[in-house]
Amino acid sequence: MKKLHFGVLISMMIVSCGDFVSNDTDGISDTVYVPLQGLDQVAIVDVDSGEVDTINIDYSQGSNTPHFIVIDEINRYWFVTTISSGYVGCYNLDTDELIDTVLVGDSPALMALNESSAKLYVSRMMPMGGMMTGAVSTIINEIDYSNPVDMFSSNEFEVSSPAPHGLAINQEGSEIYVISNTADWLYKIIIPENEETEQIVGVVMDVNSPNIEFSNIEVDRLKPIQCVSVNNSLLVVTCSAGITYDLYSGNDTIPGHIQLWDTVTMTLLDTVQFNWKSKPWHIINSPVNEEAFVALSGDNLYPRSAGVACLTYASDTLAINWETYSEDFEALHGIDVSADGKNLFVSGRGDGNLHIFHADSGEKIKSISLGHNPSAAGISTVYK
């Protein structure tokens, strides 16, 4: 495995609604793992020093396109999906050495893991947002990594909608949640014990959708991207929406949505809307407060449409706590939060930076360059 290392100059840029950058740049001891789709690499960023190591992702000839990373801090592994070559790779968290890969095919996208059972769940998607080309799928893979040198696909769950992308697991590890990027349907999969058959419950995410009774029909309206389980009965979902096409009226615009769902009854509790240019993308739950943080991808034709937002979900009600926008942000993609809940890390797929923010206010601390046209995607952070 080839490992590259280079120093990065930290740029202090003017940002946000108040055009203010915090001068608090020291003492952040987190390491952020960033898949660089455009370079077939994973960047390992020391946030405090601004130094970046890179690992080449070369599981197959041609493009691999590393897309999303999750970290198992208990068993000390990290995993990456490659949407072009169809692999999931497992690495040692302490040495960053490759341990094993498993071929799942059909454009593996997002992941959720159960650290206690050493099971990894992987969504397999179809092309979306012009980011890649690949196969249509309706499959969620379960990967057993209890023996990490010999990972294997231990189960498959099939939903009735195409392009499953967003994926989350509840705190008990008993249920996984899946959203279709093209059909606007949400699924709850009750994970089977032993040889039992899984139970799958599906609901449409928009009661006005033309496919309310036909989950296999693609409507491309809400275009949900990611979901996060914030407790054992609540799920927060991002819907990128934006420009959509209607057979009768032609092009239309739909505001970006954040939805709050009750996963026991599978009912929609509340919705917050942004403007149609916002494109809510990845989302992460605060480890200390009843808050979720959202990367707003934005529209490249509209400066200051990309940003970051904090939403509260107390009393089963969504409310925007703060929003931060800047012309320096382009196509924000991945987002994660430090274990103490104090700092946010956001990747810019378009601007090529890792942005660091104060989680309580949205003030930007600094930005770290990830190279030339890296197309940074779904990130994960760990305290080392």
Regions found by a protein language model. Give the residues of each.
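Predominantly soluble domains enriched in secretory-pathway, periplasmic, or organellar proteins
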Residues: 18-384
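Accessible peptide chain termini
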Residues: 1-2, 155
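Sec-dependent signal peptide recognition
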Residues: 2-9
